[in-house]
């Protein structure tokens, strides 16, 4: 059984309470987004989940679910046949990372525009 509270804490700690799409601070009411969608076989694991504002998740015009092609290019959505670890995520500050099973960023390219 998935421990959602624990997963939320791990993801929130990793992103330091910033939205992993827009870079603005998160409130208690944020979405855990499956990069590899559950409909594509995605798992409820810290290395497959990112923290997003609801408008960045599925409510806003620039949300990942309304812009699948762009979200796939930036790694916010992972193709069905890809492993999330092997499909880098572009953070709002321009850094490119892999998400680890320990709940950390593995930096491929690091930029410190937001202090991440």
Description of each model-found segment:
Residues 7-8, 35, 91-94:
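Extended interaction regions within the primary functional domain
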Residues 36-49:
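Short linker/helix segments within small regulatory modules
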Residues 31, 47-49, 85:
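Residues that flank catalytic or metal-binding motifs in active/ligand-binding sites
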Residues 2-31, 53-55:
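Short cysteine-rich loop/turn motifs with clustered Cys
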Residues 76-116:
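Short flanking/linker segments adjacent to small metal-binding domains or redox-active Cys/His motifs
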Residues 24-28, 49-73:
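Short Cys/His-centered divalent metal-binding micro-motifs
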């Amino acid at each position: 059984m998935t421990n959602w509270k624990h997963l939320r804490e791990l993801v929130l700690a990793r992103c330091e309470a910033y939205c992993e799409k827009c870079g603005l601070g998160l409130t208690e009411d944020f979405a855990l987004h499956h990069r590899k969608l559950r409909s594509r076989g995605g798992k409820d694991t810290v290395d497959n989940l990112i923290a997003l504002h609801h408008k960045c998740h599925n409510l806003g015009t620039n949300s990942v679910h309304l812009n699948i092609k762009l979200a796939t290019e930036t790694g916010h959505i992972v193709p069905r046949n890809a492993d999330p670890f092997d499909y880098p995520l572009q953070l709002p500050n321009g850094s490119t990372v892999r998400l680890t099973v320990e709940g950390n960023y593995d930096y491929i390219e690091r930029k410190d525009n937001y202090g991440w």
